[in-house]
Amino acid sequence: MVKAVTVLNSSEGVTGTVYFTQEGDGPTTVTGNLSGLKPGLHGFHVHALGDTTNGCMSTGPHFNPVGKEHGAPGDENRHAGDLGNITVGEDGTAAINIVDKQIPLTGPHSIIGRAVVVHSDPDDLGRGGHELSKSTGNAGGRVACGIIGLQG
């Protein structure tokens, strides 16, 4: 089993830890908890770069190794990094539990060294009709991020 972790922090007070596990060539399981977010839905994505030299802005676009349009996690046509939305409760916390086949921890399309980004607004899953729907899901600004690293 391969394990990875990212610790998310932001100047806006968002904190949390997200864990990734993958058994063999199976899907990757994503679990964790975040706090300090406004209640509601927030876009949750793997971005292409593990670069935070300019905060979350330098993490690049959504991880998209095969050049597809933005979509929902269950769509065939989606960026690999499109993990949909997380739901934040009235207390500002979110529990994450995602199983996804397009974010492996090994191989040529591994997400190790890339970034997880939490956005300020809901991801419209490519269906919002906004000019940004097919590229970012119109999910708004980047409120927290962290680099995905291997875990022992």
UniProtKB/Swiss-Prot annotation:
Pfam family membership, one: Sod_Cu
GO CC, one annotated term: endoplasmic reticulum
Cofactor(s) required for function per UniProt: Cu cation; Zn(2+)
Cofactor comment: Binds 1 copper ion per subunit. Binds 1 zinc ion per subunit.
E.C. number: 1.15.1.1
Subcellular localization: Cytoplasm; Endoplasmic reticulum
UniProt-annotated binding residues for Zn(2+): H62, H70, H79, D82
Molecular function GO labels: copper ion binding; superoxide dismutase activity
Reactions it catalyzes: 2 superoxide + 2 H(+) = H2O2 + O2
Reported tissue expression: Expressed in fruits, leaves and pollen grains.
Keywords (A to Z) from UniProt: Allergen, Antioxidant, Copper, Cytoplasm, Disulfide bond, Endoplasmic reticulum, Glycoprotein, Metal-binding, Oxidoreductase, Zinc
Regulation of protein activity: Inhibited by KCN and H(2)O(2).
Entry-listed glycosylation sites: N9, N33, N85
Broad class of enzyme this protein falls into: oxidoreductase
Residues reported to bind Cu cation: H45, H47, H62, H119
Gene3D superfamilies named in the record: Superoxide dismutase, copper/zinc binding domain
Disulfide bonds: C56-C145
Keyword Cytoplasm: yes
Similarity-based family: Belongs to the Cu-Zn superoxide dismutase family.
Functional note: Destroys radicals which are normally produced within the cells and which are toxic to biological systems. Probably involved in the protection against oxidative stress during pollen development.
Designated name of the protein: Superoxide dismutase [Cu-Zn] 2
UniProt source species: Olea europaea (Common olive)
Gene: OLE5
